[in-house]
């Protein structure tokens, strides 16, 4: 019996991939922080094929710290160091439900800065472990603020207490810092416009601190783009004037109106439930093989709703900012038992 050497047929696209890999040799970074930003944009053709929309997802999970918050953390701290407001003998203290804390912890680890992250009991054990792995200290708030019932307000009170107790304390204050929105004015939205053109019809952004929303909206306005901004907020969030309510998933929505917010930032506001986020995330991973965080599922559900309502029309082009990676939600969004316990036994049959 003669054994013949099998012929090799290069799979479609592999040649381009290899050429891109060779070209990337000239783009070697000098540090992990230089890898923040310039995230890829991919066509979500399978998920939105029937709607006739051209939807493009910006994969912020591919930032080195795993989320879009890497941009803000890096921008805030580098500007603070450059201005002299932050020095290496300072202790940085910040409130975060997870992603911004991770972004800060990464920057601080590289720059040799001390960091205390104030989190609450909704922060996942995985996120806490990541923050601590970078060398930051975690301060856990276990009870909500008695006046507002919000964990965010309790975290902010704890931040102020710690700042009063440490010498040379520095509070980045992601909810009010112009260098938060400046990160997206200077990188996120320009990257979208460069890749997809200034005539993109919609940009869809999940809200929390309103840094991404503010930066993208201000850029669109200042550049005279006709792009409409869609803000996707969580039900129970107070950002757009709705009453406060229970929210199970961290990092989406807010229990206060951030200083970065302006009433005219969004052309369209869509409120999504925790279940909308869960189902949207699962459709995204099942159809596009993108394992994304909770707010990305909310964006998927919001686009589907706007398409069904005729707000987004066939042929229009949509940029969806997918803020973070899904591994941090395996015990919640992607856990059948958690979903059934928190959202009802029939939640996954919808």
What residue ranges belong to the model's regions?
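PLP-dependent amino-acid enzyme catalytic core
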Residues: 1-350
């Amino acid at each position: 019996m003669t054994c013949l050497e099998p012929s090799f047929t290069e799979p479609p696209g592999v040649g381009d991939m290899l050429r891109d890999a060779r070209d990337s040799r000239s783009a070697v970074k000098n540090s992990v922080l230089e890898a923040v930003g310039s995230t890829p944009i991919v066509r979500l053709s399978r998920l939105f094929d029937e709607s006739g929309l051209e939807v493009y997802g910006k994969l912020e999970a591919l930032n080195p710290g795993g989320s879009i918050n890497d941009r803000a953390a890096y921008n805030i701290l580098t500007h603070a160091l450059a201005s002299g407001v932050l020095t290496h003998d300072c202790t940085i203290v910040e409130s975060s439900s997870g992603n911004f804390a991770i972004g800060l912890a990464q920057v601080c680890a590289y720059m040799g800065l001390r960091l205390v992250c104030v989190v609450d009991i909704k922060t996942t054990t995985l996120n806490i472990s990541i923050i601590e792995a970078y060398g930051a200290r975690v301060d856990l708030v276990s009870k909500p603020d008695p006046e507002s019932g919000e964990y965010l307000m309790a975290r902010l009170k704890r931040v102020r207490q710690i700042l009063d107790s440490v010498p040379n304390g520095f509070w980045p204050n992601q909810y009010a810092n112009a260098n938060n929105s400046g990160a997206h004015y200077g990188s996120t939205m320009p990257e979208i416009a460069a890749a997809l053109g200034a005539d993109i019809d919609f940009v869809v952004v999940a809200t929390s601190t309103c840094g991404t929303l503010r930066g993208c909206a201000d850029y669109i306005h200042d550049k005279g783009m006709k792009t409409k901004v869609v803000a996707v907020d969580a039900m129970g969030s107070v950002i757009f004037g709705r009453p406060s309510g229970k929210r199970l998933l961290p990092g989406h929505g807010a229990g206060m109106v951030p200083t970065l917010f302006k009433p005219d930032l969004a052309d369209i506001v869509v409120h999504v439930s925790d279940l909308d986020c869960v189902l949207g995330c699962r459709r995204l991973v099942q159809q596009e093989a993108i394992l994304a965080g909770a707010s990305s599922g909310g964006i998927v559900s919001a686009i589907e709703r706007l398409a069904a309502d005729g707000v987004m029309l066939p042929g229009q082009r949509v940029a969806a900012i997918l803020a973070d990676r899904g591994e941090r939600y395996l015990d919640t969004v992607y856990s059948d038992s958690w979903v059934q316990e928190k959202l009802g036994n029939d939640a996954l049959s919808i």
